[in-house]
Amino acid sequence: MSLHYTLSVVQASKVGSNLPKPMPPQIEESLSGSDQSAALWMGMAKWFGEDIRSVLDKIRTISFHEVEEIRLRVGQPLLVRTSDEDIFINREGKVSSPDQAHIVNREDLACALERMTHSSVYAAEEDLKKGFLTLPGGNRVGVTGEAILQNGQIQTMKHISSLNLRIARDIPGRGFKILPLLLGTGGILCHTLLISPPRAGKTTLLRDLIRIISDGVPQLGFRGQTVGVVDERGELAGMWQGVPTYNLGYRTDVLDGCPKASGMNMIIRSMAPQVMAMDELGHSDDVTAIEDALRTGVRILSTAHASSLEEALVRPTLAHLLEQGVFERLVVLSRKHGPGTIDGVYDLKTGRIL
């Protein structure tokens, strides 16, 4: 099965022989302010070809810490998205109107894909079929184009037209605020589901909770737990050649790039975790795997896309798990006051807001 990769041929000089290395989430900590932002922009720019890289390297008026997405669309202006606005960028790296911004062309996308797949687009075919790539460090790249179907299933993609690089953030400490609300009788972690719409910080919060649960919290009398993480899309740990980019704790074992359903069974058999963590429940196979996992006594910690309990209940997979009483706590996140805003923590057994 081959990927019909129909973008223009990329010159070696455009891609460069030294492909990007993973960028740690705390890159250039010795720098501060604008210098640190510039260093982070340069680190991210390495994933792109010469033209886009030149633009991003020049950015000085937009703090990298505020950026959530970098979007490339063929024939459209280069766009940087923050939490509250869309910003168009010209060839000098300055904020501009759409008609004065750098216009993305097919070669810009071709160069970026070559670098993001380490010059092996075919090796990334399975991810591209799902519509995304995951870069070292947990940064995720959405991909759209023309889907090629076989028996109603996407087999490949051609004429790639858009890339959306979503920048992963590691914000330690947020989990401390809600962990006490997730503990039940005897200080045992409750089966917990975190829900939010896209870009509202549920993966960031899940990552922090994993680390805290793994390390333990002496102040709460909460001992560290063995945590098994099934990181299907590579966003939680940001694994690079077997080493996690993000700190997930002393007692955490990560299964990277494996479908959640088969991964849960595998990690339970091999690592005997006390807590099983995963991102973005949604497939029907996930239900059976979670029900099997519960029989072993493992605690479940997961996320899903939904903006409210009512919305979650109209999604078949989530509705089944919620109606069966699998989850004991529900954490609802939003962007009301920026990503990671906690709208409420609910005790699903009593219906109370904690």
Question: Where are the model-predicted features located?
Answer:
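N-terminal accessory targeting/assembly segments
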Residues: 2-137
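Residue-level signature of catalytic and energy-coupling elements of molecular machines
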Residues: 70, 143, 231
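P-loop NTP-binding catalytic core
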Residues: 115, 119-189
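Conserved nucleotide-binding/hydrolysis micro-motifs of P-loop NTPases
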Residues: 140, 147-150, 170-172, 233-236, ...
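Conserved P-loop NTPase
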Residues: 150, 155-159, 328-354
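P-loop NTPase nucleotide-binding module
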Residues: 175-232
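P-loop NTPase switch/communication element
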Residues: 214-265
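Conserved P-loop NTPase nucleotide-binding/switch module
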Residues: 271-330, 335
